[in-house]
A protein has these predicted regions:
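Small-residue-enriched alpha-helical segments and adjacent helix-cap loops
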Residues: 1-132
Length: 132
């Protein structure tokens, strides 16, 4: 459901060039994964992310993963409720919540607001179907 500004995308590309091997991997849940950042440079990467209002908090490991929705959220003709604001509220609530930092396993949430469930909510740990 998320959007990345041009400045944020340029920063992500610069991180790949300056701190990794020139590329990054988009995960299934739309995280960007760098595999070769030297530990000694990790703080520099966090500073670069913070400069464009991004962070690395709970982006991997046993925590709540990116909250997903319909790929057509906001423009789907059968959409009754736009799920993106609900995803953002859940993200803000869970990101810094200490109870979600060390879950026994990665935890996945999806939100759908359309008649057709393109978010596959039944395959997630929590799948929310907004009223239609």
């Amino acid at each position: 459901y998320g959007a990345v500004s041009a400045a944020q995308m340029r920063t992500l590309a610069k991180i790949a060039t300056d701190f990794d091997r020139g590329y990054a991997h988009f995960t299934t849940r739309q995280n960007l994964q760098y595999n070769w950042i030297p530990l000694a440079r990790a703080a520099d990467v966090m500073d670069a992310l913070a400069a464009v209002d991004m962070h690395g908090i709970q982006t991997s490991g046993n925590c709540i993963r990116n909250i997903t929705s319909d790929a057509y959220a906001g423009v789907a003709p059968d959409e009754i409720v736009d799920p993106r604001p609900y995803c953002e509220i859940l993200r803000q609530w869970s990101t810094l919540h200490p109870e979600f930092a060390f879950l026994p396993r990665k935890f996945k949430i999806a939100v759908s607001g359309a008649k057709e469930d393109r978010a596959a909510i039944g395959w997630h740990d929590i799948g929310l179907q907004l009223p239609i």
